[in-house]
């Protein structure tokens, strides 16, 4: 099997399939990134790219066409805010995200039934409920690693998190005390960051540089250091970084693989099944190409 995109979805898919005995080739256009390669320059990162960015793709050779509200097309580079990109890396955006791990509330699955559908709104009911998805939330929380508090009335998890909540600092303690005086229930933010040593990696060092950068002590949990690592450890998964999926291959009306450019050469990858996990823009591009 071949998976295009080694982010949150593709990384987990690689682990599930490899653990089930399937042979998996996991592709990503980006590289393996760590703190040494992403740095912590607040003028050069994926959110503020005034002087370039730190997550790829390269600024030259990776244009996108952005259409503004007037219908005018603009060719933009990866460091433009109109590029609408998170990160090109093994692990995708999970390398540089803030790591909040909220579940949707049960009402989020019934927005139209709860609030109606005003003209121009996008409120819809999901075809599934919170209870349908809850077991998969739990699997993901334990696979990737979430630190959080006990269940609350607003978010009744069926099982606790694998790690305790992070300790509140002074500002958090002040806010919690004020909320309690007002009779408001509070809960700790569930975070995909180690509050204690976990999975062979260190606990959070409280550097407060999570968003936009890799973790200096590898305490932030993304697919690159959890699901993908475990997929590789099964012996059934290979990872090709810096591999650009150009188009789908077809035979007799069926998808049979991907055409991929890597290390200066074109490769025709044949597979029994193809998983597209390239994000909203790149997945759509592949399907339309």
Task: Go through each PLM region and give its residues.
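N-terminal glycine-rich phosphate/pyrophosphate-binding loop and immediately adjacent elements
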Residues: 1-117, 122, 127-131, 135-138, ...
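A broad, structural surface signal
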Residues: 15, 19, 29, 131-142, ...
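Rossmann-like flavin
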Residues: 88-201
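Hydrophobic alpha-helical scaffolding
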Residues: 123-126, 164-166, 214-221, 276-277
């Amino acid at each position: 099997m071949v998976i295009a995109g080694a982010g949150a979805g593709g990384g987990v898919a690689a682990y599930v399939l490899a653990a089930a005995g399937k042979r998996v080739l996991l592709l990503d256009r980006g590289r393996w990134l760590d703190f040494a390669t992403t740095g912590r320059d607040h003028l050069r990162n994926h959110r503020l790219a005034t002087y370039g960015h730190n997550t790829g793709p390269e600024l030259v050779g990776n244009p996108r066409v952005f259409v503004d509200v007037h219908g005018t097309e603009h060719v933009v580079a990866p460091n433009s805010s109109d590029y609408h990109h998170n990160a090109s890396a093994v692990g995708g955006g999970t390398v540089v995200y803030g790591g909040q791990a909220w579940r949707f509330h049960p009402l989020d699955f019934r927005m139209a039934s709860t609030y109606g559908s005003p003209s121009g709104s996008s409120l819809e009911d999901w075809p599934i409920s919170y209870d349908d998805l809850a077991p998969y939330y739990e699997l993901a929380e334990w696979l990737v690693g979430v630190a959080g508090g006990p269940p609350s009335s607003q978010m009744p998890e069926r099982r606790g998190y694998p790690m305790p909540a992070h300790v509140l600092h002074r500002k958090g303690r002040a806010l919690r005390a004020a909320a309690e005086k007002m009779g408001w229930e509070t809960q700790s933010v569930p975070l995909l960051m180690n509050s204690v040593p976990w999975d062979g990696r260190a606990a959070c060092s409280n550097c407060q540089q999570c968003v936009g950068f890799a973790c200096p002590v590898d305490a932030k949990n993304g697919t690159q250091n959890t699901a993908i690592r475990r997929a590789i450890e099964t012996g059934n998964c290979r990872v090709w970084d810096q591999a650009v999926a150009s188009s789908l291959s077809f035979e007799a009306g069926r998808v049979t693989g991907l055409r991929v450019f890597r290390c200066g050469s074109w490769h025709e990858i044949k597979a029994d099944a193809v998983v597209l996990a390239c994000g909203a823009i790149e997945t759509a591009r592949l399907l339309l190409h």
